[in-house]
Amino acid sequence: MLTFLIPTAKEMKPVPPCYPHQLPQKSLPILEAMAELSLEELARAYSISIEAASKEAKRLKAIAQGQSSAYPAYQLFNGLMYRHLKRDNLSKDQQDYLSKQVYITSSFYGIIPTDEKIAEHRHDFHTKVTINGQSLKHYWRPIYDQFAKDHKQIISLLSSEFKDVFSKEYQRLWISPKFMEERSGQLKTHSTISKKARGAFLTACLENNVQTKEALKQLSFAGFCYNEELSTETNYYYIKKES
């Protein structure tokens, strides 16, 4: 069975219904460390304005007091990749695929199933906070590595920010899809292309119930097709040709 890893997104959009929120035990030290920061320190930790930090302080306080609403993570995150992922009108099989084979890597919650109920928050691995003297990446690394050890065939749709939490010995075993567009005879890629294509790729996987590496190579989605020439054992290239 294939296991997919995807990143979080800064943009969030709460979609009813909401649920009671329960913070995982491993996340509590992070919440406590953030709660100790002054508004100015919080702004520096997030690299945001004081006004934006005030909003985040209220969110953190609500989480700490058990007053936050929670939403399925794949519905709450609303970045470009998530907007290009099929999230509504899923069949039971597609819903099972999304909830049992796709996991979200979070700097606040750890590695969670896509349907895990989470609260609105602003947090990533660039957040400047230490937990017991450790950076967020080092704090989560043992748990991330254990996940990689327990899941043999990982398909990584992670950016370097999230990928680098894992030890390199595990990263080397993954398959990492790469997405490029042909323009004026040249192959181009940038973050917008990649984010949109990740969502479309994952949609194709769940719609076709893809379970093997060979099946990944047969996929076509949003104009992208697998390219044998460029691909290696661990990097699968998907190219969108000029129309």
Curated annotation (Swiss-Prot):
The Gene Ontology biological process terms listed for this entry are: response to hydroperoxide
For this chain, the family text in UniProt reads: Belongs to the UPF0246 family.
- Pfam family example for this protein? H2O2_YaaD
GO cellular component annotations, sorted alphabetically? cytosol
Name recorded for this polypeptide = UPF0246 protein Sez_1855
Q: Give the matching InterPro entries.
A: YaaA (IPR005583)
Q: What residue ranges are annotated as transmembrane?
A: none
**Originating organism:** Streptococcus equi subsp. zooepidemicus (strain MGCS10565)
